[in-house]
Curated annotation (Swiss-Prot):
Stretches with biased composition (Acidic residues): 83-110
Name the record gives this protein: Osteopontin
Signal peptide feature range: 1-16
Subunit and interaction comment: Interacts (via N-terminus) with integrin ITGA9:ITGB1.
Lineage: Eukaryota, Metazoa, Chordata, Craniata, Vertebrata
Region span, Disordered: 18-278
Composition bias, Polar residues: 49-63, 71-82
Annotated gene: SPP1
Motif stretch (Cell attachment site): 152-154
Subcellular location: Secreted
Amino acid sequence: MRIAVICFCLLGIASALPVKPTSSGSSEEKQLNNKYPDAVATWLKPDPSQKQTFLEPQNSVSSEETDDNKQNTLPSKSNESPEQTDDLDDDDENSQEVNSDDSDDAETPDDSDHSNESHHSDESDEADFPTDIPTIAVFTPPFPTESTNDGRGDSVAYGLKSKSKKFRRSNVESPDATEEDFTSHIESEEMHDAPKKTSQLTDHSEETNSDELPKELTPKAKEESKHSNRIESQENSKLSQEFHSLEDKLDLDHKSEEDKRLKIRISHELDSVSSEVN
């Protein structure tokens, strides 16, 4: 607590002291200002006459430079005579002609070299690609893939078509074969296709039998259904007749009972009336 009180006291004393504005500048300038204030003021504010004295030599130097440039750019007509100018023109024309001749000479060997190169290239092309050797095109026919025709409705016709295609492909594969080779090839294919044909025929016969069986079964089923319908209708008619007969019997019984009751009532009434009369 004591330390805090001491610090607050010091801060209050420091804030109470007057603050002086700091003057900018070095110590030497401060001393000069204090000793010779008038001289410093005149040094900081020079006269306009002094400025003109400083600018005059600069203007003279720049004017001399511009004069030199003009003399260099403009041709001196007074020193040169018309004869000298003509000689200079002739020299220029001769130099241009010589330069053009040199350029033509330089271009001509290039053209000759280019023509020689083209000639050599034509000869090399002719040597590389001779036209005497005939070109033979190699033909590779696709190999046919055998597939079974089981389970097809048109298996017989499909087998005949595939057989004709095989014959054509065999002709394409062996164009130079003899007739004997061709006949042997056909016989081997027929022997190979014989079991396939028999299996195809059996499949076809089974399919036809399976088609005929449902055709035969359909009229029988229709007859049976008709017979069953007739029997049911007859039974229904019998049941309805029996039911009606029972209803009639019940009605008759009910009527008979009512008649009996009426008769009894009438008899009682007659008895009562007779008793009263007596």
